[in-house]
Amino acid sequence: MYMLAGFRALQGIGAGGLFSLALAILGDIVPPRARAKYQGYFLAVFGTSSVLGPVIGGTFAGQSSILGITGWRWVFLVNVPIGFIALVVVARTLNLPHSRREHRLDYLGAVFISVGLVPLLTVAEQGRTWGWGSGRSLACYVIGVVGIAAFVWTESRMGEDALIPVRFFRNRTFALTSVVAVVIGMGLFGGISALPLYLQIVRGATPTRSGLELIPLTLGIMLGSVISGQVISRTGRYKIFPVVGSALMIVGMVLLHFIGATTPYWQTGVCMLVFGLGLGNVLQPITLAVQNAMPPQDIGVATSSSTFFRQMGGALGVAIFLSVLFSTVGGNIKSAFDASAKTPAFQTAINDPAVQANPVNKPVLAALQGHGSIGGATINDTSFIQHLDKALARPFQVGFSTSMDLVFLVGAGVLVLGFVMLIFLPEIPLRTQSAMAAREPGSPVGGVPDDRR
């Protein structure tokens, strides 16, 4: 596991900038008003890939061996030819003029932001195991706060060479969307992280099938991104889309809060579609608003900063919301067993000789007789639930579903905060010049928005 984490970190060094860099390149070569359309296409493709990836990965993971190599290893190997093809295409087609500018690299800023965020992410994930007031948790709090304080101090001294120049936050749009990005990221990734768990643990779907069952979410993202991009390109108005989109995300998350262990899939699919429509209307216009509000020379840093804040919010959201899930699931499973124990069907099942003889059922039956804990072991391994007798499996599914409902409700609450902040998002007229054209000598300064707005 440590090797996996280390190599993923190495992979992240190269991959971390690809998403924001693609959006920054669009910002450089396409005027904001026309850019909305292309960013809509970009996010639609991204959403499609987000579903195809888990499906393909699940297919590989489900194979014991392919060409003499363990199936799950192909999840990583398949990226090599895809990355090579992308490298060749970019090298042959992306030929943009660029000017070199001497600047200092903000090594200290990169170190301090890592020192600040890693301990906070760690305690958000491990706090339920360590104890939120334990020595290790307190150490993470202190190191995290000191690291972030040192990062802010370093950025103020680095000026224009900072990872995130402090002057950016004097721009109202950038400052507001940075906070919104953290909040939306928390609600988005934190809430959605429970969906595959619901589909696999509660509904019993395989990893491949659960990826396919996320298609309504992807369809919503595609429709929301493309429609908002087309309308913004025609009207030049963008503020209404993230406001309406965040409202749809809240509605979708609240609807997901009401799904249960026996909810038909079509109802879950409708909830995901509503949430995806909202998400598609939020991500693209927010990026567009940031790029339009900043001077052309700052678009790259501003775009990557916005992506950074969203990813950090997402990482915190996943860690915090999964902590909520797993800290409550044990008690909810026990409550579900207490309720089921009173039903004739459950009593019939536990007294059935065939059920008692099945070795998969024996640990649960022993726990029911007081020889173990119900719910504790399921946190680390849930695969056995799908092999249990249906009557014994149902309380586990109900317990997980109840905890996931809480996660969706917390996610909706976080998204409400984002919705309120988006109401105050300034709407600056979209420029008709690309950033590249605006930087050319003789370009009218009117193409650059007022940095104070």
What are the residue ranges of the model-derived segments?
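MFS-fold secondary transporters
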Residues: 11, 90, 255-256, 275, ...
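Transmembrane-helix exit segments and adjacent C-terminal regions of multi-pass membrane proteins
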Residues: 85, 89, 98, 133, ...
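Interfacial helix-cap and linker-helix signal at transmembrane-aqueous boundaries
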Residues: 56-69, 124, 199-200, 231-232, ...
